[in-house]
Amino acid sequence: MQYYFGSKTGLIDALLERRMEELNRRRYELLDDVDPEHPARALRRIAEAMVLPFAEHLSVEGGSSYLRFVAQVTFSADRSVFEMMRGRHDSAVRRIADLVQQLSRDRRPDLVRHRLAVVTNLVLFTIGEREKLRMSGRRTGVARIGTAEFIEDLVAMIVDVLEPHGA
């Protein structure tokens, strides 16, 4: 298998690539109606664009495995998922960063990027961890929370982190 993909990195890239175009497209759909003139609604929609494309994979065949894989790669690979996807299916993520910066004019751009990196890691880790626990049959931690409530709570946490207050 490594020969076919050229290397372990090539294999990881191919597996990530498999769904990233779809995730990017879905994020754009969710961002279409973001209106910076209505900051609270805009931040909510941005948070949904960060969570829902991944959360929707919870009900897709093989989606749970993919989510656990992305979480594992994010926290154990030599390169971050961000580096692996830079310039490939990440334009919606750049759009999210632009929108959040627009809504957080008083916050320095490096702090906006930091917050976005933290919430992205939160999304990937939390969904991956929930799926790992769920697939192992353990109903502890986040695996005890129903899917809809889990997603809603994750979106709410992201809104809280990205809100401009306290900038």
PLM ranges: what are they?
Residues 18, 69-73, 118, 122:
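Short acidic/histidine-centered micro-motifs embedded in hydrophobic/aromatic stretches
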Residues 14, 28-66, 116:
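Hydrophobic alpha-helical connector segments
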Residues 22-26, 73, 77-80, 126-134:
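A short secondary-structure junction motif
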Residues 5-28, 32:
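An amphipathic alpha-helix adjacent to DNA-recognition modules
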Residues 87-167:
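C-terminal peripheral helix-coil segments that are non-catalytic and often amphipathic
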Residues 51-95, 143:
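Short secondary-structure transition hinges
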